[in-house]
């Protein structure tokens, strides 16, 4: 049966973890789909891992649509979320709708955008017009220059309270999922408890409703991996076995371990 947003919400209610991986093409989509990954995130991380840029900022909407079509072509079961790239949604809700509609037409089941309270009106605008929205708080890669680098967010009391408030506001506006990136595990646990929608963590501890990794990090393609990642290909023997090990580790709660959290 195809995974839907209702499926993901039901998994959260049952306490079953949601396994998410980034995906950029049809071949990996087929492997990930068959291995039981619940959600495929067509991430603007492709700017770094596919295109070789130093950040996600150069990625264009046309490129996101292209990779979304590729992933959709290889997927029969998993739920597909596609990132709105930098500059495609920030100017206005109307601009966001035009960009989101393009990704939905390419095969996405939901779009993802970054930002807190400033994005509430945009989330409400999209949700009211039938476009499912995944929010994204904590480290915001599209704001890396403003944030001063890839640093853990929410460590200060005021920042933590604001993140919780933003998460609640985004859910009230109509967001159906939310990614929490590089925030302290205790804060992610608090946010998860405050929301009805599933939280998907990356570097956010084990108490989120699900976990996401950049697939290339999970497969150990780089000599240096983020603290929150793990090489599941080491000793697995094949990409398929590695992905199945990742899904199993997320589902049974053994990943992420304390060593992967902040």
UniProtKB/Swiss-Prot annotation:
What residues form the catalytic site here? 181 (proton acceptor)
Which biological pathway? Cofactor biosynthesis; (R)-pantothenate biosynthesis; (R)-pantoate from 3-methyl-2-oxobutanoate: step 1/2
Protein localization: Cytoplasm
Q: Which Pfam families would you find in this protein's record? A: Pantoate_transf
| Cofactor binding summary note | Binds 1 Mg(2+) ion per subunit.
The UniProt keyword set, sorted, is: Cytoplasm, Magnesium, Metal-binding, Pantothenate biosynthesis, Transferase
Example of a GO biological process term = pantothenate biosynthetic process
Q: What class of enzyme is it?
A: transferase
Residues that coordinate or bind 3-methyl-2-oxobutanoate: 44-45, 83, 112
User: EC number(s) for this protein?
Assistant: 2.1.2.11
Chain residues that bind Mg(2+): 44, 83, 114
Reaction(s) catalysed by this chain, per the record, are: 3-methyl-2-oxobutanoate + (6R)-5,10-methylene-5,6,7,8-tetrahydrofolate + H2O = 2-dehydropantoate + (6S)-5,6,7,8-tetrahydrofolate
| Source organism, top-level taxon | Bacteria
Q: What does this protein do?
A: Catalyzes the reversible reaction in which hydroxymethyl group from 5,10-methylenetetrahydrofolate is transferred onto alpha-ketoisovalerate to form ketopantoate.
Q: Subunit info?
A: Homodecamer; pentamer of dimers.
- Identify this protein by name: 3-methyl-2-oxobutanoate hydroxymethyltransferase
**Gene that produces this protein:** panB
